[in-house]
């Protein structure tokens, strides 16, 4: 029985899973929309939403905590400065998952995961996003 067991194994080791979620979180923060398999998207949703909830507080302890998870300074800057302020009044539900059919090779279910109220022009240039936000 699976009582009180949270998360998905995704058929990888725990260190692989941790690194994969961190890398996918950086990609989602930079591009604001990524395409992946449905189970990975569902797992990433809970991972990224806890990071955004922490980032709304925006102090040094939160910055260090988030940096220990995703290990990318530019992504942490965007997470705290842009996404944290964008979702300041939203109590949760920062992402949406859109099902996109099945992959050709193995029929794995594919989905897009994106931020609610995302910037459509965000194409992965984190430095430009952070600089534009600090100019205002």
UniProtKB/Swiss-Prot annotation:
Keywords: Ribonucleoprotein, Ribosomal protein. InterPro entries: Ribosomal_bL17 (IPR000456), Ribosomal_bL17_CS (IPR047859), Ribosomal_bL17_sf (IPR036373). PANTHER family: LARGE RIBOSOMAL SUBUNIT PROTEIN BL17M (PTHR14413:SF16), RIBOSOMAL PROTEIN L17 (PTHR14413). Part of the 50S ribosomal subunit. Contacts protein L32. PROSITE patterns: RIBOSOMAL_L17. One of its GO terms (biological process) is translation. It comes from the Bacteria. The keyword Secreted does not apply. HAMAP family: Ribosomal_bL17. This is Large ribosomal subunit protein bL17. The gene is rplQ. The keyword Ribosomal protein applies. One of its GO terms (cellular component) is cytosolic large ribosomal subunit. GO terms for molecular function: structural constituent of ribosome. Belongs to the bacterial ribosomal protein bL17 family. It comes from Rickettsia canadensis (strain McKiel).
